[in-house]
């Protein structure tokens, strides 16, 4: 088993939204960055993987097991941080430790308190006194403290200052040094994913638009800036999307080197994941 997670033709219909045949794989030892606008389908996909949303069609396998048939065994080995997951505010971090000891077979109190110390989280203070960033750190500490093989993280660095964010990213990178472990990381902070993700899956309006390695996206793709005259000479099969402004055209291309050889247009910008998202969503085919 080379893949720790496999999602095949996942579909789910709501009154005003539909997840349409979502498929992707997460190999062992890798970080997959899951990107898209709010409402694009990221959270529905994650909650389907976790069997929180279970009235879907398609197949999801985690650790080589069907997630519906093996829910309890699978969750024993998953560390979870959800954007809408909250601990009761009257509890303190020590209370969380007592609760988690009864939930996870492999709960490691020593490791948990080590993370609390690293994150400067007071053990005896009620969670209601914590800032948003402190609460997020507590969720991350909890997710890591039962020796999971897979981390599923929805906006894990939201609310963290740059120093704390870098600290958390370092912890995630340490986590996958064990080649049996992987991370599915959904985030709006695309610069984080540019540094740590091995794969990028881009979802929009319930459909997967791109699923590539990070290096392929950032090194091969590019945005060409050209005049209207130059744009009219470009074959429609040679670009993915374009945007027109008052003074120029911006054209998203899949292979900037090959494009430049063919058209000899030298104004090609290095792409970021944010650029890619904007062009894929706002650009014209």
Ranges and model annotations:
Residues 239-285:
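C-terminal coupling/interaction segments
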Residues 92, 213, 269-272:
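Short loop/turn segments at beta->alpha junctions
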Residues 28, 228, 255-257:
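Non-catalytic surface loops within mature trypsin-like serine protease
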Residues 169-253:
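ABC transporter nucleotide-binding domain
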Residues 111-114, 230, 272, 276:
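Exposed alpha-helical structural elements
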């Amino acid at each position: 088993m080379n893949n720790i997670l496999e999602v095949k033709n996942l579909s789910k219909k709501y009154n005003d939204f539909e997840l349409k045949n979502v498929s992707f794989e997460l190999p062992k030892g890798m970080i997959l960055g899951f990107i898209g606008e709010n409402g694009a389908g990221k959270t529905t996909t994650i909650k389907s993987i976790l069997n929180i949303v279970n009235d879907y069609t398609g197949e999801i396998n985690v650790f080589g097991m069907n997630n519906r048939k093996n829910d309890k065994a699978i969750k024993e080995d998953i560390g979870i941080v959800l954007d809408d997951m909250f601990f009761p505010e009257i509890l303190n971090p020590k209370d969380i430790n007592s609760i988690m000891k009864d939930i996870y077979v492999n709960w490691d109190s020593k490791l948990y308190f080590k993370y609390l110390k690293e994150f400067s989280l007071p053990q005896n203070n009620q969670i209601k006194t914590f800032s948003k960033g402190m609460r997020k750190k507590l969720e991350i500490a909890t997710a890591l403290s039962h020796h999971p093989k897979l981390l599923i993280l929805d906006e894990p660095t939201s609310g963290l200052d740059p120093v704390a964010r870098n600290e958390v990213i370092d912890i995630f990178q340490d986590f996958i040094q064990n080649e049996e472990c992987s991370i599915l990381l959904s985030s709006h902070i695309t610069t984080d994913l540019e540094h740590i993700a091995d794969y990028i899956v881009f979802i929009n309006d319930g459909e997967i638009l791109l699923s590539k390695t990070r290096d392929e996206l950032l090194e091969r793709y590019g945005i060409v800036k050209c005049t209207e005259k130059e744009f009219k000479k470009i074959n429609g099969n040679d670009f993915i999307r374009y945007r027109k402004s008052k003074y120029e055209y911006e054209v998203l291309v899949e292979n900037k080197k090959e494009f430049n050889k063919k058209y000899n247009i030298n104004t090609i910008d290095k792409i970021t994941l944010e650029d890619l998202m904007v062009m894929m969503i706002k650009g014209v085919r």
